[in-house]
C-alpha cells in the first residue's frame, strides 16, 4: 500500500527536511550540547514540528508559532512550563539570525539579474513590448523603479499586478489547464510568497526552482524566460514580470517579519526573566545565574533599537538554556504561576494589616473550618458592579535590576514522596510544596515604596513572642540587597551592591545534588518557620550549632531515617504552639482615644502655667 502511494504521480514535490542533531539551529545561535538537550526532552513528533518551524522556509511569526507543538517526554514534564518558553524564544532568535542572512542573499541574487547595462536595456524593451498600448503612461516607470527590496509593499504589489493583468487582452495568452492548482508548488519552499495568476506551467517550474534556491541560499542567479531565449514571447514577458514583482514583494515581507521578530524577541526575553526570577525562589542555587541574566537583559534594553542585538540575544539564550537544564535536572515541579499567586496573596495581606500585626500569622492562618464541605451553604455575595482584579495591574510585578533578588524572607521548601502503585514496579514521584512556601517580599515592597528592612522588621517584630517554638537566640546574617538607585549606572553595579538586613531564621547552605534515581534532595519535610534557604555569600555571626538540624552536614547521613520522626515532631509542635491572635481593632481605638485625651490635658495645663 505504501509502495502504491509512492508510485502515484504528484503535482509537486514536498521539500524534505534533514532532521539533524541540531534541530536546524545554526551553530552561531545554539551550541550542539543545548540542541541535544532539546532532542532528549521532546518526543519525536514534537521534535519534527520544531524542526519545521525552525527551517529555512520564510514564514510569519504566527505560522511558526502554530507549527510548533511542544510536547515533552513524561519524565521531563516537571520543568515543561519554563522549557517551552525558552525553546520558543530560541526558535525565534534562530529565525531572526537566519532571516537576516537570507534576505541579504535574496537581494544580492535578485539584483544580479539586471546588474549590467545590457540587462537593463533588455528589461526596458520587454516592458515596452508588454505595455505597447500604454507607452505614454507612467505604468512602466512605476513598475521598473519598484523592483528593489523596499519598493513593493502589499499595496503597491496589488496595483502592479493589476497593471500587468491589463495587458493580458492585448495578446493571445490563454492559461494552461489547472494552472491555479499547479502553481501551489511555489509555496513549498516559501510561505510568504503571494502567487499571482500565472499562465504557463513551464514558467511555474522555473520560478519554483528560483524560489527554492533563494530560500535555501544557493549562489545562483534566478532564471527568467525572456532572458533565457532569443524569442521574446509576450507570454514569457507577462509571467516574468509577475514573478519579479511577487518576488520583490516577498523580500519586502521578509524584512517586515524580521522587524517584528525584533520586537517579539525583546518582549519575550523580558517576560521570561520574570519567570526565571520566580524559578530562582524554588532553586536558590540559580541565584547568581539569574542575576547575570538580569544584567544581560538590562544591557539589551539600554541598547539603541537601531543597533544589531543578536550578540545580546545569543548571550541571553545561553543563560536561559543553562537555567532550563538546571531546572530539568532538579526534578522538582517548576511553577512560576504558583509562586506569583503567593505574591498576590501577600500583597493583599500587606494592604489590610496593621503595623503591630504578625504577618506570618496572617499569612498562615486559615479562615476555613475543619468541618466537611456544606453544599447548601451559599457563596459570599459580592457587589456585581465592583471590578477589582489585581492581575490587570501591569506594575504589580515589574522585575528590574533594582528589585531582582533583593531579599528573600521565606524560600520554597519541596520534598519528594514515593507512592507505590498497586505493588507494581511503577513508582510515582510526587513533589509537594508547603501551603505558603514562597513569598517574594522584595517585589511587593518595591511597589509600595517600602524598604526591605521595614518589611523584614515587620516579619520579625513578633519573633520574641513566638520564640516558644524556636530557640531563644537568633543569628544575624548579611543578605544581599539592592536599594533603588537614582541616576544612570550599569546593571552590574546595581546588582552587586550589598546592605545588611536582619534575617528571621537560622540559615544553612544547601547545595544541588542528584542521586542515581534522579531524585531531588533540596530538603525533607521541614517547618518553614524553623528553616529558610539562604542567599549566597552569607556572613554568619554567633550562629548556633546545627547538629540537630535535619539539613546540617553532620546529620546528612541520617536524613532519610529521621524523616518520619521529624514529621511527627513537627505535627506535635504545631499542636502545642499557641495561636497568635491579632490585636483587637477596638483595643487600638481605645488606646488612641486615651493618648489624645492625655495630649489635650497636657496642653491645657501648659496654657494655665
Swiss-Prot record:
Residues 465-478, 503-513, 552-563 have a biased composition (Low complexity). Residues 461-609 are annotated as: Disordered. It comes from the Viruses. Phosphorylated. Its main location: virion. The keyword Phosphoprotein applies. Coiled coil: none annotated. Keywords: Host cytoplasm, Phosphoprotein, Virion, Virion tegument. It is found in: Virion tegument; Host cytoplasm. Residues 484-495 have a biased composition (Polar residues). Residues 600-609 have a biased composition (Basic and acidic residues). Belongs to the herpesviridae pp85 family. This is Phosphoprotein 85. It comes from Human herpesvirus 6A (strain Uganda-1102) (HHV-6 variant A). The gene is U14.
